[in-house]
């Protein structure tokens, strides 16, 4: 299993038509974003004082991420992307 460092996240991209809360996103919105599930999170980042700031998302969250963000990786037969937390646009709450 992949364990990201810092504020990075491992995401499993959903390969189906994108919806947010049951609403299908318009074609142009689908081209700019993708829906993914958070598979793993890094510990977060440290402030200048040394305090740890944990990620805003947790494993299992569904998120909306920028379409071209991240690095494509494989772990066995599974495909994932690794992104920085700044590339997450929203958490999808259902």
UniProtKB/Swiss-Prot annotation:
Keyword presence, Nucleotide-binding: no
Gene Ontology cellular-component annotations = cytoplasm
Gene Ontology MF annotations: ATP binding; metal ion binding; protein folding chaperone; protein-folding chaperone binding; unfolded protein binding
Q: Where in the cell is it found?
A: Cytoplasm
Superkingdom, taxonomy of origin:
Bacteria
Q: What does this protein do?
A: Together with the chaperonin GroEL, plays an essential role in assisting protein folding. The GroEL-GroES system forms a nano-cage that allows encapsulation of the non-native substrate proteins and provides a physical environment optimized to promote and accelerate protein folding. GroES binds to the apical surface of the GroEL ring, thereby capping the opening of the GroEL channel.
Q: Which family is this sequence assigned to? A: Belongs to the GroES chaperonin family.
Name of this protein:
Co-chaperonin GroES
């Amino acid at each position: 299993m992949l364990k990201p460092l810092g504020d990075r996240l491992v995401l499993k991209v959903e390969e189906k038509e994108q919806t947010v809360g049951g609403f299908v996103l318009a074609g142009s919105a689908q081209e700019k974003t993708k829906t993914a599930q958070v598979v793993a999170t890094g510990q977060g980042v440290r402030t200048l004082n040394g305090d740890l700031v944990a990620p805003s998302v947790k494993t299992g969250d569904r998120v909306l991420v920028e379409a071209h963000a991240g690095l494509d990786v494989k772990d066995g037969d599974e495909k994932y992307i690794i992104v920085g937390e700044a590339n997450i646009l929203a958490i999808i709450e259902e």
